[in-house]
């Protein structure tokens, strides 16, 4: 998990990794002037099931359903299969200008994920040591 502990309990049952509050605070400190975003700390399937039809947003006393994402930060789990599953959820819910940032891309096959996302109009725009950014250009 994020703290280096095995993902299996002593009795052999799988253990769900935690997202410690310190990681959340570190993430949020990188966006001091961006107040208009929501950070959901949910497991993938929990998020997909809850918000597959959109996220309810309340603005000026009105409820709107947001089902198009402008920015998605992928930070774990770090397997090609799971990251691709996440990307495939968000790709059809994106628009031109949407940016996907993948953390720790060297721990999975980022080239395969980028190749699949080409078919959704994404192109790799920046590649760093630990992060990779793709942007939807068409």
Predicted regions and their residues:
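S-adenosylmethionine/decaboxylated-SAM
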Residues: 1-138
């Amino acid at each position: 998990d994020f703290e280096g502990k095995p993902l299996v309990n002593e009795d052999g049952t799988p253990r769900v990794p935690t997202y410690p509050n310190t990681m959340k605070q570190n993430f949020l400190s990188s966006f001091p002037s961006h107040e208009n975003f929501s950070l959901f700390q949910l497991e993938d399937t929990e998020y997909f099931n809850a918000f597959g039809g959109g996220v309810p947003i309340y603005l000026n006393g009105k409820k709107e359903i947001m089902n198009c994402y402008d920015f998605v930060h992928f930070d774990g789990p770090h397997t090609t299969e799971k990251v691709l599953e996440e990307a495939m959820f968000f790709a059809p819910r994106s628009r031109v200008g949407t940016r996907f940032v993948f953390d720790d891309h060297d721990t999975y096959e980022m080239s395969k994920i980028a190749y699949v996302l080409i078919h959704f109009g994404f192109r790799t725009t920046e590649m760093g040591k630990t992060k990779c950014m793709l942007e939807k250009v068409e």
